[in-house]
Amino acid sequence: GSIEIKSSDTRIYPKIKMNYLSTDEDREIAGKSIKIVRRVVLESKAFKDYTPEEYRPGTQFKDNESLAREAGKFANTIFHPVSTCKMGNDENSVVSDNLKVKGIKNLRVVDASVMPTITSGNTNAPTMMIAEKASDLIINDQK
């Protein structure tokens, strides 16, 4: 995805393009995830008494590509987007390990967007840890 700053006025919201399911890897993971849920819910003994049925995306969709396409029509992030400004050393990373935006002087990103991948639990605690580490980095830079 991308974020475009439209104005130096902080009251003007940026243009945000999420680009969900835009990579082969995203679509493959979405398809595999739906297949896992199907196996656990529709085929396991644990749910048999509840006679579960699949409404979306629908059992007619079998391959990862069609599953991802259908998932894209109704899926959302539940307000936990991460990895939009990924930290790392690879070409797709936005910030370095000191949280500084690559190629821009005096700008850091200090939020869940720097996580390279989403955590398996709630994102709140890791985000607070990132902020705590950032405060140390900023203080040390001033020494």
List the model feature ranges, each with a label:
Residues G1-P126, A134-K143:
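FAD-dependent oxidoreductase catalytic-site/capping-region signature
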